[in-house]
């Protein structure tokens, strides 16, 4: 075990740490700022979350990589929002557990093509997140 850990440590010293920096090095501000900006990024999405009506079959892979908007805006009142979208055709394998059959199939997934920082709240809505009422009316469940 000690030999393995030593080999890993030597490898990291030669190649650098997985994050792209050598241990002890500080990532430059501009690099951090640019990488955190609102932009399209490859994101893994579950096929069943994107196509909830398809629960009777099994998909391989169970998730796919698509471009989605993500990142930080310079103002907390703004959020990273898609301003351009298109449909991507992605080939997957669909397996039917009842018939033990499988087939290759093309499914459609929404991809973001452009992003912008936009206000979190629309005009006419009260600004800010809705706060839960303290001591207010609580939802009643049938078994309470």
UniProtKB/Swiss-Prot annotation:
GO terms for cellular component: extracellular space; membrane. Disulfide bonds join 38-80, 69-115, 73-117. Residues 120-144 are annotated as: Disordered. GO terms for molecular function: chemoattractant activity; growth factor activity; toxin activity; vascular endothelial growth factor receptor binding. Residues 1-24 form the signal peptide. Its main location: secreted. The keyword Zinc-finger does not apply. The modification Pyrrolidone carboxylic acid is found at residue 25. Snake venom VEGFs may contribute to venom dispersion and prey subjugation by inducing vascular permeability and hypotension. This protein induces angiogenesis probably through VEGF receptor (KDR/VEGFR-2) signaling, as well as drastic hypotension. The hypotension is mediated by nitric oxide, which is produced by VEGF-activated endothelium NO synthase. May also induce vascular permeability. This is Snake venom vascular endothelial growth factor toxin VR-1.
């Amino acid at each position: 075990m000690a030999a393995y850990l030593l080999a890993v440590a030597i490898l990291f010293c030669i190649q650098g740490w997985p994050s792209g920096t050598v241990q002890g090095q500080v990532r430059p501000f501009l690099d951090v700022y640019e990488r955190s900006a609102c932009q399209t990024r490859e994101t893994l999405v579950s096929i069943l979350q994107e196509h909830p009506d398809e629960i009777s079959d099994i998909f391989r892979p169970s998730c796919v990589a698509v471009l989605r908007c993500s990142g930080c805006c310079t103002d907390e009142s703004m959020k990273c929002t898609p301003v351009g979208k298109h449909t991507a055709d992605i080939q997957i394998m669909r397996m039917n557990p009842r018939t033990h059959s499988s087939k290759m199939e093309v499914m459609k997934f929404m991809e973001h093509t452009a992003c912008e920082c936009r206000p979190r709240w629309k005009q006419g809505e009260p600004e800010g997140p809705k706060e839960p009422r303290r001591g207010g009316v609580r939802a009643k469940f049938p078994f309470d």
